[in-house]
Design a protein with these regions (language model features):
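S-adenosylmethionine
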Residues: 1-451
């Protein structure tokens, strides 16, 4: 007789600690870490919800939490052991923002985890800091804007001081504040329906039958915002390729490029393939799309997504898109260059980016973007259309790149466009503001090559 021993399932707080350690100390991505943990452990619904809330909540409030830790600690926050810093942040987040959780549970669980992951001295330190907070919890008021405007905003919006300063200087305080507020909203799930498998109207009825409330995205006929019932959506719909989870802003570049059936299209920086498959669906799976990316494992992901969605016109291959490819000069009717960027438009979805970027990091992106755009221009047929896009709001990676390119390439001209709810482009360029679109920040430019 054999006995099978089930793998013990750690608590939501223990798993949140593990996830946050990987994100904050090992540069993992929160969404990928959470997907892995949720796939590995059969958590009850309430535990899965708490895990997700703790991970994203701590990341969204990290500046505020570290500031409080600094007020309570006899050591400088940066010198604290990472385990201590993360455990204190998890506990303080619960004590400050999850009032449904008893204070004793928040404190005792962190002390229990500390005993497993660090030495006794740190355990005592964690316990002492948390008990100290409970005694003083009503005394932690943020400094006012009159006292220190930059510190206030960095703590209130939970953004790095350099980013607060740069964007307030660039756009004015009111506009920057609106963008920072939008970044701290929990994003709604948005999906793109696959019309190759089912007409959009039929899919909309199917959502309703399943008790899933969805609202059409005005500028995207195949796009929907899931208002409620999102948990019921992660099943057959996705596995069968009936729909794809994608941010609304991310769907705009392909929409603007508007590839047609029978055309030849290049997606230069294609992984994970969301825009590639979107274009194939727009083309009715007729024509040809070459999809490039630098890394073979990402190419495998593009192929996997294409197969799942029933797409046969995508030809994906590993390429360094900065290297000249004379064999494909003037081959394509349309080219999409969704360029690598600083990612400063997607801070609501990829919360951790705000804690990884520094002002000096931003200089590395424009040279790469310029090189890629120069190559993209060579691959486009005369009379063809090129779309350049990024998921950042940094002007040096957006308007400046396109404006310089147009000055150097008189054979290219901007093509203006308009999208319902997002407004009209100016000189072929449109910034999608997260506070206006209720989606990620994006930049899209549409350029035509003369005959």
């Amino acid at each position: 007789m054999t006995h099978s021993t089930a793998k013990p399932v750690p608590s939501a707080r223990r798993l949140a600690y593990q996830a946050l350690y990987d994100v904050l100390e090992k540069d993992a991505y929160s969404n990928i870490v959470l997907q892995r943990i949720l796939a590995e452990y059969p958590l009850k619904a309430e535990e899965a919800h708490l895990l997700t809330e703790l991970v994203y909540g701590v990341l969204r409030k990290y500046n505020h939490l570290l500031w409080i830790i600094g007020k309570l600690s006899t050591q400088k926050v940066k010198k604290l052991h990472p385990s201590v810093r993360i455990l204190l942040a998890i506990s303080l987040y619960q004590l400050l923002f999850l009032t449904r959780i008893p204070a004793s549970a928040a404190v005792n669980e962190s002390v229990k985890i500390a005993k497993k992951v660090t030495h006794p001295g740190n355990v005592r330190f964690v316990n002492g800091v948390l008990r100290n907070f409970l005694r003083k919890k009503d005394s932690f008021q943020l400094p006012s804007r009159e006292e220190d405007a930059l510190l206030h905003d960095a703590l209130f919006y939970n953004q790095p001081r350099w980013l607060i300063e740069d964007w307030q200087n660039a756009w004015g305080v009111e506009k920057a504040d609106a963008v920072f507020s939008a970044f701290n909203e929990i994003p709604s799930m948005t999906i793109r329906v696959n019309p190759l498998k089912q007409p959009v109207a039929d899919f909309e009825r199917l959502l309703s039958e399943k008790g899933i409330e969805a609202a059409p995205i005005p500028y995207l006929p195949e796009g929907f915002t899931i208002k409620s019932g999102a948990n019921r959506f992660f099943g057959a719909f996705l596995k069968e390729g009936l729909a794809y989870v994608q941010s609304a802003s991310s769907m705009v570049p392909a929409k603007v490029l508007s590839p047609k059936a029978g055309e030849t299209v290049l997606d230069m920086c294609a992984a994970p393939g969301s825009k590639t498959t979107q274009m194939a669906e727009m083309m009715g799976n007729e024509g040809s799309i070459d999809a490039w990316d630098l890394y073979p494992h990402k190419i495998a992901l593009i192929k996997k997504n294409a197969k799942k969605e029933g797409i046969t016109i995508i030809h994906a291959g590993a390429r360094d898109a900065t290297k000249p490819m004379p064999a494909v000069h003037e081959k394509y009717d349309k080219v999409l260059l969704d360029a690598p960027c600083s990612g400063l438009g997607v801070l609501s979805h990829k919360v951790e980016i705000r804690w990884r970027r520094a002002r000096e990091d931003l200089v590395e992106f424009p040279p790469l973007q310029k090189a890629l755009l120069e190559e993209a221009a060579k691959y486009l047929k005369k009379g063809g259309t090129l779309v350049y896009s990024t998921c950042t709001l940094n002007e040096a990676e957006n308007e400046n790149i396109v404006s310089e390119f147009l000055r150097n390439h008189p054979e290219f001209t901007p093509i203006d466009f308009q999208l319902e709810g997002l407004g009209a482009s100016e000189k072929g360029m449109l910034t999608i503001w997260p506070d206006r679109a209720q989606s990620d920040g994006f930049f899209v430019a549409k350029l035509g090559k003369s005959d």
